[in-house]
Amino acid sequence: MIARCLLAVRSLRRVGGSRILLRMTLGREVMSPLQAMSSYTVTGRNVLRWDLSPEQIKTRTEELIVQTKQVYDAVGMLGIEEVTYENCLQALADIEVKYIVERTMLDFPQHVSSDKEVRAASTEADKRLSRFDIEMSMRGDIFERIVRLQETCDLGKIKPEARRYLEKSIKMGKRNGLHLPEQVQNEIKSMKKRMSELCIDFNKNLNEDDTFLVFSKAELGALPDDFIDSLEKIDDDKYKITLKYPHYFPVMKKCCIPETRRRMEMAFNTRCKEENTIILQQLLPLRAKVAKLLGYSTHADFVLEMNTAKSTSRVTAFLDDLSQKLKPLGEAEREFILNLKKKECEDRGFEYDGKINAWDLYYYMTQTEELKYSIDQEFLKEYFPIEVVTEGLLNTYQELLGLSFEQVTDAHVWNKNVTLYTVKDKATGEVLGQFYLDLYPRDRKYNHAACFGLQPGCLLPDGSRMMAVAALVVNFSQPVAGRPSLLRHDEVRTYFHEFGHVMHQICAQTDFARFSGTNVETDFVEVPSQMLENWVWDVDSLRRLSKHYKDGSPISDDLLEKLVASRLINTGLLTLRQIVLSKVDQSLHTNTSLDAASEYAKYCSEILGVAATPGTNMPATFGHLAGGYDGQYYGYLWSEVFSMDMFYSCFKKEGIMNPEVGMKYRNLILKPGGSLDGMDMLHNFLKREPNQKAFLMSRGLHAS
């Protein structure tokens, strides 16, 4: 997400909500107010600073606003007949680059800084700048001049990407309501500011949540010793268990004590329940009202207009069709799990209640994997020490995409455990960008897995290219004494997925910042990263990624084959859960009178066949609702149709490490960024329209 669990925060997408709104700026003749901001007007290097104090963040935020507004005001005073491509469209793009890079240094620290005051200042900067974004995006005088440019400019003489920039600018202006009466514009502006603040607060609440539970060793039954040894002790015989992923999932998957799992699941799905429920009750009606004012039936209709799906009817049909196809598989998997539970309750002397509870699901899905394929993830992870996985991952991407990575020594980073790499084209030596790896959990750090686009790869005013910069932020388990961080196979998959977003950010080479990196349709953005997950299900690829942390021995061929064969395990229930989340998201953004917790519970029962725990409110913990995926969570499944089609029709057929296919993928899918529509890129790559055949096969189904 971007993230597997949250919206990946991409180059022009904000954790606080929707895409960064159109910043209608003008420039070359009036750029002087911004010259003092940074040296990045004349260089393509990484200019990002991570040592700003709270006071500096506040001061630079105000300076950025004042200086940028001076440019906007100058544009607004231009005579309507004076507008040209150079003094409007191109200059707008030049200023946009400056603003994006400076803003990154101000609002990214809220997600990664260990300093509470810095995080607070960064969050306030994000709110302040988001309000400013909205103000500037709704400048009617700027919009009028852009419309005038379209009417008078000889479009045949400008590059296709520039025409796209012009068309998107006008489209976004209309989606902001700039063609409507001033009174309506002001109403929309006010609501957008409030929505932005609510989104920022929603995810801040989740990031800052420090809930933990305390258990005795007996209550952590069947959890491995290395996990228990890594826990903070409370008194002499109690252990502190947080709700962060490195604690939550091991407990839910391996702890044999039902009451422990019940308490964990209850706590996890009541995080920020009170405050975030209130936020949703305000946010959802505001979105609906803005959509109505703009002429759309629902907020879902509003956001889907810009996606490859285009309409709520297509999304609903896709989800309902997939749900029906998976229904028999889900029923069979639930029956198997229920039999496992019944037998275990008999063996351990537990009361058998005859149903699968929410806190049973991960536990018995793990047992299913172990029984059917003899795979013990705790044993398997000993072959995935993070250093070996990282080296194998980097080598795979370098070989596949024709790149070389070099670690930067003495790099300027936000934490001592963060590393920085430079990316070069292997054939030419050209520097394409840099990426940070922030792999381990810290207090108050962003608690999911995501790629953050930090600096856009685009053209600068002097014609040189600014390098793209991205950060991969995840939360793998910390190394402990005598033992490195060991990754479960699903964490290796997450690593590959998120690094796929990093490569999209780095390899895209566009003229305009707005189209750089992962700034594509929301239901297409996961395609490149999902496609690259296939490498962790290939025997030869897995050999490159693994080595026992003690003696360097390889995984046995037998175990590798079992691991690859296990890919379809629990796929029915896992996919049905994704459908549940997608349906909840669609429902809440088409009917604001619905209660979020009740809607989630309804779909859990109807589609997943596993009841939500009474008293929980999972949507209040669902960061995607306020993280840029509003009405668009379906995109994870939708985009897999495309990613699987690409993989099976090209890589699986020609060889997954075939450098020619890898370069084709880099040039036709990654390099264009958002300068082309996603469907056009797919057609260029596949040489045909995409279909669902490979996707259905990946779910254990057959195309009708």
From Swiss-Prot:
InterPro entries: MetalloPept_cat_dom_sf (IPR024079), Neurolysin/TOP_dom2 (IPR024077), Neurolysin/TOP_N (IPR024080), Pept_M3A_M3B (IPR045090), Pept_M3A_M3B_dom (IPR001567). It catalyses: Preferential cleavage in neurotensin: 10-Pro-|-Tyr-11. The active site is at E498. Zn(2+) binds at H497, H501, H504. Keywords: Acetylation, Cytoplasm, Hydrolase, Metal-binding, Metalloprotease, Mitochondrion, Protease, Transit peptide, Zinc. Belongs to the peptidase M3 family. This is Neurolysin, mitochondrial. It comes from Pongo abelii. The gene is NLN.
